[in-house]
């Protein structure tokens, strides 16, 4: 798989998905990474610590199929340090090549098959006005436990 995306768009998507990446990986090193795969509208980045999963889509031009898991922190640092412009990421068997302008590097990838499978929620979604949600959270947060 290969995709092209604007640096700022990719950096924003990484920042959101990275919030769910496990800080301690324990027995599953794949949880320290982001799964990247093509989607209908571009590229999908998924981060998970098995309790929280965040999926983000970023507009991009994609070629090919497949997915891979890149080390989240390292990938984020690389993308943030790039000059603004188009970033090209190409995945081969066990590496991701990142190119932007004259910059080129490669990262080792992990198998996407080891990444946890996500189950889609069943039933219809719910819409809540932002103000109502904010007010509800403001009322219950003081009672929430700080130990968990």
Region spans (language model):
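Structural preference for solvent-exposed beta-strand-turn elements
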Residues: 1-148
């Amino acid at each position: 798989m290969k995709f092209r995306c604007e640096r700022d768009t990719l950096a924003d998507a990484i920042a959101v998905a990275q919030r769910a990446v496990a800080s301690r990986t324990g027995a599953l090193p794949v949880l320290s990474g982001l799964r990247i795969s093509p989607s209908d509208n571009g590229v999908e980045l998924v981060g998970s610590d098995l309790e929280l999963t965040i999926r983000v889509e970023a507009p991009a031009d994609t070629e090919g199929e497949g997915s891979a898991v890149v080390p989240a922190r390292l990938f984020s640092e690389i993308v943030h340090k790039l000059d603004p412009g188009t970033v090209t990421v190409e995945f081969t068997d066990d590496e991701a090549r990142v190119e932007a302008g004259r910059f080129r590097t490669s990262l080792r990838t992990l198998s996407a098959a080891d990444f946890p499978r996500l189950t889609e929620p069943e039933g219809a979604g719910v819409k809540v006005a932002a103000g109502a949600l904010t007010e509800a959270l403001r009322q219950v947060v003081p009672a929430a436990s700080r130990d968990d």
